[in-house]
UniProtKB/Swiss-Prot annotation:
It comes from the Eukaryota. This is Transmembrane protein 254. GO terms for cellular component: membrane. The keyword Plastid does not apply. The gene is TMEM254. The chain crosses the membrane at residues 15-35, 61-81, 95-115. It comes from Pongo abelii (Sumatran orangutan). InterPro entries: TMEM254.
């Protein structure tokens, strides 16, 4: 059986990656739902590129947005499975892994994948 510390293992991810992901997803949300309010001319090279995507591929942007969230849901569910497989049995720790992976995706999941916890015996 896993140790008490291993059963409650949780590690917060890199602040750098969390900031990058938050800003990127925030910008993506802005582009998908409020494209008319974006100051394209003030965004440097990103402005004309974003405007082109909004004008010519808005449906693709919307579908990609929802697909990204669906992938985050899948990653979160996989994080729960990994927690159980690696001996992280604390409900609080599992919830933290689920939420962190839901909001930050692979940046969180790679930390959990790298964790070398005790594996539970399968019956």
């Amino acid at each position: 059986m896993a140790t008490a510390a291993g059963a409650a293992y949780f590690q917060r991810g890199s602040l750098f990656w969390f900031t990058v992901i938050t800003l990127s997803f925030g910008y993506y949300t802005w582009v998908v739902f409020w494209p008319q309010s974006i100051p394209y001319q003030n965004l440097g090279p990103l402005g004309p590129f974003t405007q082109y995507l909004v004008d010519h591929h808005h449906t693709l942007l919307c579908n990609g947005y929802w697909l990204a969230w669906l992938i985050h849901v899948g990653e979160s569910l996989y994080a729960i499975v990994l927690c159980k497989h690696k001996g992280i049995t604390s409900g609080r720790a599992q919830l933290l892994w689920f939420l962190q992976t839901f909001f930050f995706g692979i940046a969180s999941l790679t930390i959990l994948i790298a964790y070398k916890g005790k594996r539970q015996k399968q019956t």
